[in-house]
Design a protein with these regions (language model features):
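Active-site neighborhood of glycoside hydrolase catalytic domains
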Residues: 1-50
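Catalytic-core region of carbohydrate-active enzymes that cleave or remodel glycosidic bonds
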Residues: 22-26, 56-153, 157, 168-171
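Acidic/polar loop patches that form or flank catalytic/metal-binding clefts of enzymes
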Residues: 33-34, 114-120, 175-181
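Short beta->alpha connector loops
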Residues: 37-39, 57-61, 236
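Generic recognition of flexible, low-complexity loop/linker segments
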Residues: 40-42, 64-68, 105-107, 218-222, ...
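Extended carbohydrate-recognition surfaces in non-catalytic/accessory domains of CAZymes
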Residues: 146, 157, 168-242
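Aromatic-lined ligand-binding clefts that engage carbohydrates, nucleic acids, or primary amines
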Residues: 241-255
């Protein structure tokens, strides 16, 4: 897969082709795909020669596949991300649940008309600061759980969605009769009280090394793909500062 939903963000075929060429140079020989939102603007921006266009969506299968047909040049139709649930964001009021009957109908239609990759087949866990976030009108960070209302739960429990999807698959492919024997015990560990604490500022020299720069450096510039960056700056001026503008300061800023 070359990039992911890049057509939502930019129109830059030279970049996408460069990514494809790098993969080829390093020995990738399997067929290439692009993975886009099935809308004409994003497909026009994200599709390139030599890669099968696929779509990411969770409903309206016929409508989405009809758009894909205009870009696949007779090739196979593929839903690369069939969204069977959604993220849990902090403050969204509880665990997100999809409509099972609609999921089953769309899954059936996808197998009838084309191909599908289930997202997610099994839920996962966002460890540490790897939770990520959506950012449309405002920042909406994900919680630790990435259960996603998936076909199998975060801890591997078999769901009704699993059973219903299995029935759909059996319409198109013979499935062996396998006894489902998972018996996963769950346990509540109660309430854990935190008694000790330490300030971040008192431990900085032990957990990190400073980087000095005239300009603010991004995570990419610093070779960092995880966690946070703590920025410090001293404004040398004898005049009173009445207004400071901070762009996209999503966490904390002390002045």
């Amino acid at each position: 897969q070359i990039e992911n939903e890049y057509g939502y963000f930019a129109t830059d075929s030279s970049y996408l082709n460069a990514m494809k060429n790098i993969m080829t140079e390093y020995g990738i020989t399997v067929p290439f795909i692009t993975s886009e939102g099935p809308y004409r603007d994003s497909m026009n921006a994200g599709c390139i020669e030599g890669a099968l266009p696929t779509g990411n969506f969770g409903s309206k299968t016929e409508e989405r596949f009809e758009i894909l047909k205009d870009y696949t040049n007779g090739g196979p139709l593929m839903c690369a991300e069939f969204w069977v649930g959604w993220f849990d964001h902090w403050g969204n009021g509880g665990h997100m649940k999809s409509n099972l009957e609609e999921n089953v109908q769309d899954f059936d239609r996808m197998l009838e008309l084309g191909n599908v990759n289930i997202y997610m087949f099994q839920g996962g866990t966002n460890f540490g600061f790897m939770n990520g976030s959506n950012y449309y009108d405002e920042l909406t960070p994900d919680v630790t759980s990435y259960d996603y209302d998936a076909v199998l739960t975060e801890d591997g429990q078999i769901t009704e969605k699993y059973r219903r999807f299995r029935e759909v698959i059996a319409k198109y492919k013979e499935i062996p009769d396998v006894k489902l024997s998972m018996d996963i015990k769950r346990k509540s560990y109660g309430r854990l009280e935190i008694k000790d604490k330490v300030s971040l500022s008192s431990t900085l020299d032990k957990i990190s090394k400073p980087v000095f720069s005239v300009y603010t450096q991004s995570m990419e510039k610093l070779g960092q793909n995880y966690g946070y960056i703590l920025y410090h700056s001293t404004l040398d001026t004898e005049e009173n500062i009445e207004r400071i503008k901070l762009w996209k300061a999503n966490d904390r800023a002390n002045i």
